[in-house]
């Protein structure tokens, strides 16, 4: 049972827009950024929602590693491809423009692909692929990130958590939406554990001596020093398939950097050798596929829906009541939350009040009663 107070969706949306604007983000861009963060909370992905509003976006605008005004330059374009320079502006704004371009290209040519460099955190990858799904198409996206994941048989943080996302239309009430990091856990989840006062489960982090860590705050601190790292999907070594996750992480790293000729791995740390801040210069990639250029959208949706229904109807393991398919839990989270709002713990409450008071914004939150 949820015990945290809720902030209504409309109020949180308006508040974040006003705060973004106060820090110099143009209103149209602020609306995009607020919606991306709220969509994460709508889906129950709290590691990438309002939990990150201040530390990942506002604080980075303040420290100069994220520019509030996004100057987008298209450095190369063909009928089916786009390469975009985000010039260290809002990654969410550049990604929104990219998906608009690719969807229109895919309407005409059936497929389209794009790459962005010199970017910043773009929120949940599934937001961009869902833009394609809402247009009746298939969306694929991934991004690199600051180094935090060790290669199989290694202990040094080399690559980011590098999410890989696929969203596909179905004939059900929700799409197939597979959106996950290619590591055992994402940084945002550990940040969420730390802010909630919870430990990180054992076995997700490897230390220099091959051990593990569970203190969430210590993990975040030591990872930035290079003293521990996250493990790729599959975990430690090869016996449980860690090399497979390592492969997926590497695929995302290559596509995120090489398609646009951008930086990679240690160059994305956001820190200079002397410890001072610098731009993150992240890279993202996007692909859009139009089913109408194959056997048609209706055929695709019916077949996809049939596959998902057969999976959910298959024999369950002892003690399990339900089999889920990707995107289903996010849909259920929205049904649970749509009339309530965004759940906010104590740390987020403090940040909301701090930002409101700093800019003298006319908001009163229910948790203050």
Tell what function each PLM region has.
Residues 199-265:
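Secondary-shell segments that build the walls of catalytic and ion/ligand-binding clefts
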Residues 2-12, 254, 259, 263-369:
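Catalytic-core signal marking the mid-to-C-terminal active-site face
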Residues 81-171, 177-181:
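A generic, well-ordered mixed alpha/beta core segment in the N-terminal half of proteins
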């Amino acid at each position: 049972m949820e015990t945290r107070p809720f902030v209504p969706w409309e109020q949180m949306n308006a508040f974040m827009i006003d705060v973004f604007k106060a820090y110099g983000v143009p209103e149209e861009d602020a609306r995009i950024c607020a919606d991306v963060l709220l969509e994460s909370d709508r889906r129950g992905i709290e590691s990438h929602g309002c939990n990150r509003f201040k530390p990942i976006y506002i604080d980075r605008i303040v420290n100069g590693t994220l520019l509030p005004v996004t100057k987008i330059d298209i450095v190369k374009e063909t009928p089916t491809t786009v390469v975009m320079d985000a010039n260290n502006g809002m990654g969410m704004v550049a990604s929104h423009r990219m998906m608009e371009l690719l969807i229109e290209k895919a309407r005409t040519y059936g497929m389209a692909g794009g790459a962005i460099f010199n970017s910043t955190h773009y929120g949940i990858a599934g937001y961009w692929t869902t833009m394609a799904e809402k247009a009746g198409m298939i969306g694929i996206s991934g991004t690199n990130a600051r180094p935090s994941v060790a290669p199989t048989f290694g202990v040094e943080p080399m690559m980011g958590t590098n999410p890989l996302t696929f969203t596909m239309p179905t004939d059900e009430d929700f799409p197939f939406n597979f959106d996950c990091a290619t590591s055992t856990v994402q940084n945002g989840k550990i940040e969420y554990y730390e802010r909630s006062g919870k430990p990180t489960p054992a076995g997700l982090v490897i230390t220099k001596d091959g051990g593990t860590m569970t203190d969430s705050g210590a993990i975040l601190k030591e990872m930035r020093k290079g003293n521990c790292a996250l493990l790729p999907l599959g975990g430690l070594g090869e016996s449980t398939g860690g090399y497979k996750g390592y492969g997926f992480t590497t695929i995302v790293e290559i596509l995120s950097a090489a398609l646009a000729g951008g930086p990679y791995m240690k160059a994305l740390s956001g820190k200079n050798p002397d410890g001072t801040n610098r731009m993150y210069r992240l890279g993202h990639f996007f692909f859009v596929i139009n089913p109408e250029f194959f056997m048609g959208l209706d055929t695709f949706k019916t077949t996809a829906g049939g596959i998902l229904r057969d999976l959910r109807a298959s024999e369950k393991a002892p003690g399990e009541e339900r089999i889920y398919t990707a995107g289903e839990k996010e849909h259920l989270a929205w049904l649970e939350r749509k009339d309530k709002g965004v759940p906010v713990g104590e740390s987020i409450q403090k940040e909301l009040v701090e930002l409101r008071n700093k800019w003298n914004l006319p908001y009163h939150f229910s948790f203050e009663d």
